[in-house]
Amino acid sequence: MKKNIFADTVLKGLSLKKKKLPSWLIYDSKGSEIFTQITKLENYYPARCELEIFNTHKSTLSKLFSSTPTQLIELGSGDGKKTMALIRQLIEEGVKFQYTPIDISKGAIDNLVKILNQNFESSSLNITGLVADYFEGLASITENNKLRKMVLFLGVTLNNMDIPDAKSFLKRLHQLLQKEDYLLIGFDLMKNPKLLNQAYNNELFEKFNLHLLDRINECLQANFNKNLFVQQAHFNPQSRAVESFLYSTCKQTIQINSLNTNIKFAEWETLQTEQSFKYSIEDIENLACESGFKITENFYDSKRYFVDSLWQVIK
């Protein structure tokens, strides 16, 4: 990641009257490791629900590859568990396909390629990891490439975007894809707010959010003291989003040497660090239509907590 982007984002967010920083700032190797631990918690359902979806519907998904040669592209590499279920199904059915995961982290790509090669070493799996920004990577793949594409955008990454940002993201994807290409995209559905509060309030989520302060200290020579902040997430019924905050437990001034600035916190002043919007099916239908896609099928887990929605490009 370019340092100036990190620095500019931090300065802009901490200068707001209501301080707010995007959650992508948390993700370095340690931040990713903490989040992987979160996905294994009993109360944190999205990863478990999505793995169930892939195990239940992998045969249906594999049929999309049988009619024409297809390139499987994944935005964000993750740990490969969900994708592995689909890849195994495709290999067992003798389907020919190319798999290209795209991630800005070289370590994440190298780790995923290693895991998949170990699991499918006796197969003819054609995998090429790409270290790049999503759009730069997708543009390099689609240029002069007429293979049909199946793009996977799994997990809750889109849920973490503001609705206008989500629309902008999807419209950019649409521009890079060809008519009748597929997009399989994960959505966390609206549910009992008590379940949401349980999912986002625990020691690991606090550790994850506080790691943001470590990153600012490390990258920008700041002096945040994590012991002077506590984390709490709340469901906001107006925005239909779980919003996570760090609360300053005292009046304090933070020095950020690389930015040549001081940031003041009042006692119990908040810094918003995360947001995760919860969707209805109607929301998803509208989002697909406004972004240039049509929904061909929705795949749910047994509790209907989560949906992987299969979209096709309209042009």
Regions found by a protein language model. Name each.
Residues 68-78:
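Conserved class I S-adenosyl-L-methionine
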Residues 79-94:
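Conserved SAM-binding loop of SAM-dependent methyltransferases across substrates and taxa
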Residues 103-107:
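Conserved SAM/SAH-binding beta-strand->alpha-helix loop
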Residues 122-136:
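Conserved SAM-binding strand-loop segment of SAM-dependent methyltransferases
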Residues 197-277, 281, 285-291:
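Substrate-binding/catalytic lobe of Class I Rossmann-like enzymes that use SAM or dcSAM, i.e.
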